[in-house]
């Protein structure tokens, strides 16, 4: 009996040795963008659905705003306060040195959307299961702040049980991978017209 308990304890210890939690300490920030709610005559829309604050997240805000932003905030701070509803963008990059599975945990804002490499994700109870390849991932969090509410920056962590080295940063630099070699748009051929006035360039795009 004691032997079984010792073996089980040793296994649990080994599992904990490989478990890693990466806390996102800094996020690139853009906003807040004040959003005025619609003038509501009826509480229901044409589909008999009641308007909710979450609908304000549908407001289109280009992600390039946060990519070009020079404002970096500590995740432990706030981004001020707005008299009206506002939408903000917070972003960071996840880098993994190998294939690994993990969980991205997000807390803070009540209403938010998560995009990874421009693709919208669907978290469940603030958690998102991810399978990372050895490359860089861009994570953008679009979140809503209610009127006169403190704009709390999202708290984000990534948990994995593997030996992978995963880092979170606001630096857009990335590794040069095989996808950079094979994927993308490249010049295939170039030819000059007989009179020398025109240049015909053929491009090839691979995915």
What are these regions (language model features)?
Residues 20-76, 138-178:
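Accessory carbohydrate-binding/adhesion or oligomerization-edge regions at the termini
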Residues 69-78, 111-130:
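Solvent-exposed beta-strand/loop surfaces of large extracellular or lumenal domains
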Residues 84-94:
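Short beta-strands within extracellular/lumenal beta-sheet-rich domains
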Residues 90-92, 126-130, 137:
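Short strand-edge motifs at loop-to-beta-strand transitions and within beta-strands
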Residues 96, 100-113, 139:
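Aromatic-lined ligand-binding clefts that engage carbohydrates, nucleic acids, or primary amines
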Residues 133, 190-198:
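Blade-terminus and WD-like Trp-Asp/Gly-His loop motifs, strongest in beta-propeller folds
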Residues 184, 203-207:
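A flexible loop/linker signature enriched in serine peptidases of the S9 family
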């Amino acid at each position: 009996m004691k032997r079984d308990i010792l073996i089980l304890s040793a296994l649990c210890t080994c599992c904990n040795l490989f478990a890693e939690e990466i806390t996102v300490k800094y996020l690139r920030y853009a906003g807040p963008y004040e959003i005025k709610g619609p003038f509501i005559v009826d509480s229901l829309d044409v589909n008999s659905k009641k308007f909710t604050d979450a609908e304000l997240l549908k407001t289109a805000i280009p992600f390039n705003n946060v990519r070009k932003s020079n404002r970096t905030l500590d995740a432990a701070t706030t981004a001020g306060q707005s008299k009206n509803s506002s939408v903000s963008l917070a972003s960071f990059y996840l880098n993994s040195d190998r294939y690994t599975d993990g969980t991205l945990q997000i807390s803070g804002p009540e209403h938010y959307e998560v995009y990874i490499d421009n693709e919208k994700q669907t978290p469940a109870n603030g958690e998102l299961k991810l399978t990372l390849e050895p490359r860089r991932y861009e994570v953008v969090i679009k979140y809503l702040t209610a009127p006169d509410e403190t704009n709390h920056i999202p708290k984000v962590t990534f948990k994995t049980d593997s030996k992978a080295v995963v880092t979170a940063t606001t630096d857009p630099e990335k590794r040069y991978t095989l996808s950079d070699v094979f994927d993308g748009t490249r010049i295939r051929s170039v030819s000059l017209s007989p009179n020398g006035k025109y240049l015909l360039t053929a491009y090839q795009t691979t995915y």
